[in-house]
């Protein structure tokens, strides 16, 4: 993490439980990020907080640190807790899994058990883990409600509630589910509630604050919505040139770790086919991909076994993937906020990144709203049609996927 990205607030100077403080120190957490520096003094004192900051600024560690501290300082050694004491709700199952992974080192050091509850698969496995005992339940609203209604878990011992990517949960229509679960917990006055998100509209704050106890609202205002370390670039390709331009730019940029976003599953499959045929180590992440496959793809991408991930917006929110060097908007998103969320995959934690967008015949109409929202025009670049790569015959999903270890090659072309 870049030093100029951090604040002057040290974790060691905060009123942290010794186990949490020492564990963070062993993991190399010395200085807080700005959102951590502002939120932790509030949450460590048991006061509710709603924090807004750009993706990749340390929101997850902000609420995990406060959660473990609160549980350690509010436990009775003479009591056994048969039900969860903390509930962390995420907008997607991938985000829930990543939060669980991030919490693992703290859970081990603190002697607290975490468990996952999300839809898609693993119902019995998740159930068995919960029945073995859980202190911190991390999941999505639907599966958690299932377990509550079945009597598998009770929420009457909850001491901490976290809503992560809160605006996304509201956008997805989870407001009734959230309220159902919060009403099953102890009242806001006797629990700690934390709400974090990259964007937080007034409407969302108003809805969420009904179930919080006089929360303090904090915001880390970026220099610009898209992050000043992200180099943005815009092309105006014809529909005929669009795919060839993508492949050509891939060869020119040669990204170490890249996400390509498109607006539909069909378009993502098409992009995957051409990139795979061109010899790239590429994975496909859409809503139709089975849960186990999705998690496997994310792990391969994170571990560096895949260089490119082609995704719909299901992957745009909450995924904590470090070292993404490039983001391609093959299609400009219909929702202007999704542009910010997409390119927020790169330029994280003080690193630099590149965002390249195509304003094609179909989606160029989305550009004015995006530029109005981000507060600046995206620099335009030109290309020469005759310099574009010739398209290979694309792979189709019904054909065997090339081995993940397939070596990428460079195609040579005249610029």
UniProtKB/Swiss-Prot annotation:
GO terms for molecular function: ATP binding; ATP hydrolysis activity; RNA binding; RNA helicase activity. Its EC number is 3.6.4.13. Residues 241-389 form the Helicase C-terminal domain. Keywords: ATP-binding, Cytoplasm, Helicase, Hydrolase, Nucleotide-binding, RNA-binding. Disulfide bonds: none annotated. InterPro entries: DEAD/DEAH_box_helicase_dom (IPR011545), DEAD_box_RNA_helicase (IPR050079), Helicase_ATP-bd (IPR014001), Helicase_C-like (IPR001650), P-loop_NTPase (IPR027417), RNA-helicase_DEAD-box_CS (IPR000629), RNA_helicase_ATP-dep_RhlB (IPR023554), RNA_helicase_DEAD_Q_motif (IPR014014). It catalyses: ATP + H2O = ADP + phosphate + H(+). A motif (DEAD box) lies at residues 164-167. SMART domains: DEXDc, HELICc. A motif (Q motif) lies at residues 9-37. Belongs to the DEAD box helicase family. RhlB subfamily. Component of the RNA degradosome, which is a multiprotein complex involved in RNA processing and mRNA degradation. This is ATP-dependent RNA helicase RhlB.
């Amino acid at each position: 993490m870049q030093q100029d990205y951090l604040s002057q607030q040290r974790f060691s100077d905060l009123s942290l439980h010794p186990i949490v403080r020492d564990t963070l120190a062993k993991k190399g957490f010395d200085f807080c990020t700005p959102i951590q520096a502002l939120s932790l003094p509030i949450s460590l004192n048991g006061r509710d907080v709603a924090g807004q900051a750009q993706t990749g600024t340390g929101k997850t560690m902000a609420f995990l640190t406060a959660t473990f501290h609160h549980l350690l300082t509010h436990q009775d050694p003479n009591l056994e807790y048969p039900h969860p004491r903390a509930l962390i709700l995420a907008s997607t199952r991938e985000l829930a899994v990543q939060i669980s992974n991030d919490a693992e080192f703290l859970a081990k050091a603190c002697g607290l058990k975490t468990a996952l509850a999300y839809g898609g698969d693993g119902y019995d496995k998740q159930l068995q883990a919960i029945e073995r005992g859980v202190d911190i339940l991390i999941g999505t609203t639907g599966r958690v409600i299932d377990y509550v209604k079945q009597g598998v878990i009770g929420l009457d011992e909850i001491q901490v509630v976290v809503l992560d990517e809160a605006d996304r949960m509201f956008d997805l229509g989870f407001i009734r589910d959230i309220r159902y679960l919060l009403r099953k917990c102890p009242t806001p006055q006797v629990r700690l509630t934390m709400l974090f998100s990259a964007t937080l509209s007034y409407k969302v704050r108003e809805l969420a604050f009904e179930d919080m106890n006089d929360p303090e609202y904090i915001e880390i205002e970026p220099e610009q919505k898209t992050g000043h370390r992200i180099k943005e670039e815009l092309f105006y390709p014809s529909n005929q040139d669009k795919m060839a331009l993508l492949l050509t730019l891939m060869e020119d940029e040669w990204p170490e770790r890249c996400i390509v976003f498109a607006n539909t599953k069909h378009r993502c499959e098409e992009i995957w086919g051409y990139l795979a045929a061109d010899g790239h180590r590429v994975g496909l992440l859409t809503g139709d991909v089975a849960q186990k496959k999705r998690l496997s793809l994310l792990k391969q991408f994170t571990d560096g076994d895949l260089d490119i991930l082609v995704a719909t917006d299901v992957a745009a929110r909450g995924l904590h993937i470090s070292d993404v060097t490039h983001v391609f908007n093959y299609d400009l998103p219909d929702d202007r906020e999704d542009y910010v969320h997409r390119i927020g995959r790169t330029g994280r934690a003080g690193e630099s990144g590149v965002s390249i967008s195509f304003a094609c015949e179909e989606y160029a109409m989305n550009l004015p709203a995006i530029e109005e929202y981000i507060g600046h025009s995206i620099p335009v670049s030109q290309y020469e049609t005759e310099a574009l790569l010739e398209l290979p015959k694309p792979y189709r999903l019904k054909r065997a996927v090339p081995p993940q270890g397939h070596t990428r090659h460079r195609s040579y072309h005249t610029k």
